Structure formats: C-alpha cells, structure tokens
Amino acid sequence: MSRIGRAPVEVPGGVSVEISARSVKVRGPKGELTVPVGRGVSVREEDGKLLVERSSDAPQHRAMHGLTRSLLHNAVVGVTDGFAKTLQISGVGYRAQLQGQNVVLQVGYSHPVTVQPREGIQLEVPNPTTIVVRGIDKQQVGQMAAEIRRVRPPEPYKGKGIRYEGEQVRRKVGKAG
C-alpha cells in the first residue's frame, strides 16, 4: 500500500465533497475545485474523511493511488486556506508594480514587462521588490509563479533577477583579472 495513498483526507466543516465516477468536486469558502480520479482508483467518503482505494497492485494503479490522494488533499487545503507563493526581486533598479490586476516588471530590459494573472489567480505587490501569487489551485499558483520568474531568472554572478522566497542561487566566481 502507498503510504501517501493510505492516509485519509480530512474534510473540515464548511467544505462539501461531491463524488462522481471519474471526478471529485470540492467546494469550500474560497471556491470550488474538481479533481479527476484516475483508472483503478476509487474515492469514498466516510466519517468526514475521504478514503482513496485502488483496485489492484498494478504499477499504474499504485502510482494513481498516491497521486489522487495528494490532489484531493491539495484541493481541500486550497478551498479552505488557499495557496501563496512569494517571489523576491533583486537587482539595482529592478522593481514591480501593480496596474489593475496586472503586474508590470522593470527588470533590466529596455521595456517594462507586463504579466497578466491566470484565471483564479491574484497577484499582490506588497513592496516594489516582492510579488505574492495567491489562488486556490496549487498547480496554477506554482505555474504562475514560474512564469513570472522566467521573465528574469536569477543569474549566478551577482544574483540579480526574480527568485522564489527562500531559493538559494548558486553563485559563481567572476573572471580573475
């Protein structure tokens, strides 16, 4: 048995779960998410918990077992608390500002770069060197943060660029001479 797949998913109060043949719909105070259920895996609700079971020990079914449980857990956390990812901007003159829902980045190019949020994602700029990406879908939040980071990834010599909060940038020594 998968250690991850075996663990039940707690369903807190205020969250409703609707189970159908190939998907599970999770509704909560922050919104609604639909989680697909793969082949060979079934989901049932028991005593305020979601239990994920698999039909056989085939490698594909074992893989889907843990994956489905993790996706369900992320959906429950997303509709109750939501997810956030913080990006730090470092570099002389590098900054971000909010224009409506879009973020305008000035990160060393000859022109400002405008980033539009995906549907269901909110972008915040608490100060000019910090961007916070918020949403209920963990995958979408991570994808949006990766797209913003890709505008100017941190470079290894001076560390200038956009990085995730807590990310360690491997530094290189410059040319001698």
From Swiss-Prot:
Gene Ontology biological process terms from the UniProt entry: cytoplasmic translation
Organism ancestry: Bacteria, Bacillati, Actinomycetota, Rubrobacteria, Rubrobacterales
Coiled coil: none
A cellular-component GO term for this protein: cytosolic large ribosomal subunit
Similarity comment: family membership: Belongs to the universal ribosomal protein uL6 family.
Protein name (database record): Large ribosomal subunit protein uL6
Function: This protein binds to the 23S rRNA, and is important in its secondary structure. It is located near the subunit interface in the base of the L7/L12 stalk, and near the tRNA binding site of the peptidyltransferase center.
Any one GO MF annotation of this record: structural constituent of ribosome
Subunit organization: Part of the 50S ribosomal subunit.
Species per Swiss-Prot/TrEMBL record: Rubrobacter xylanophilus (strain DSM 9941 / JCM 11954 / NBRC 16129 / PRD-1)
The entry's keywords: Ribonucleoprotein, Ribosomal protein, RNA-binding, rRNA-binding
Pfam families the record matches: Ribosomal_L6
